Amino acid sequence: MILLVDNTIEGKGSSPREIRSALQQIEPDLRIVNEPFQNISSEFVKTLSPSHIILSGQCHPWDRYSAESLAGIFHVIRTAPQPILGVCGGQQQMALAFGAPVGLIERIAPGEGYGGAFRERGFCNVDLNSPAGDGIFGGLPETITVWESHCDEVKTLPADFNCTATNNVSDIQAMQHGSRPLFGVQFHPELFDSEHPHGRIILENFLKL
């Protein structure tokens, strides 16, 4: 069973739905429990006992999220034994949970929030730093093509994390904890197709952990 943490505010965002759809393509019988981020606590996760946890993306800037609403999921990220995959904003959430900074890639015009911000979007190339067969990138070439859609990025690696992928827009396109099964990707592996299958392989690898 997968716990899919919905990081959207009031359901405004497609990431949780797209992740669920991708997982169902890969494993049609997979049980997926979707839960809003503000409802997550260590007690909730212990009772549910999922095999894996996925943190969805979001479409609001992180300053729209209160510290109180994030406290439970932050504690889960820091302490849960299950493999955790942070997708796009989920990677940023993982970084924030460990005290690392997150911010805009670049503001290219006046505006507030994501207004006037540069957005990396579309199928883009990402270079892997991870050894072949390692973690969630097993069976992939040195350069993968994956869907990007983000204005924010992780600015500095959290303590005990390694950068496992990069490109010319964001230095930290993926990260992995040194001793726990914590993985973050800035891109959207759930948005794959027959011409761009690398995202699917990443999700398949994660489910095998």
Q: Where do the language-model regions lie?
A:
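Pocket-forming structural segment of enzyme catalytic cores
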Residues: 98-178, 187-197
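Short, charged N-terminal beta->alpha structural module
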Residues: 3-27
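Flexible gly/pro-rich beta->alpha loop and the following alpha-helix that scaffold active-site loops
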Residues: 20-86, 98
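Conserved beta-strand elements of the Class I
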Residues: 1-3, 101
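Cofactor-binding loop segments of dinucleotide-utilizing enzymes, especially the Rossmann-like FAD-
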Residues: 5-7, 35, 89
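Glycine-rich nucleophile elbow surrounding the catalytic serine of serine-hydrolase chemistry
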Residues: 88-96
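Acyltransferase
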Residues: 8-11, 185-209
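Glycine-rich His-Gly loop
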Residues: 6-8, 55-59, 151, 187-189
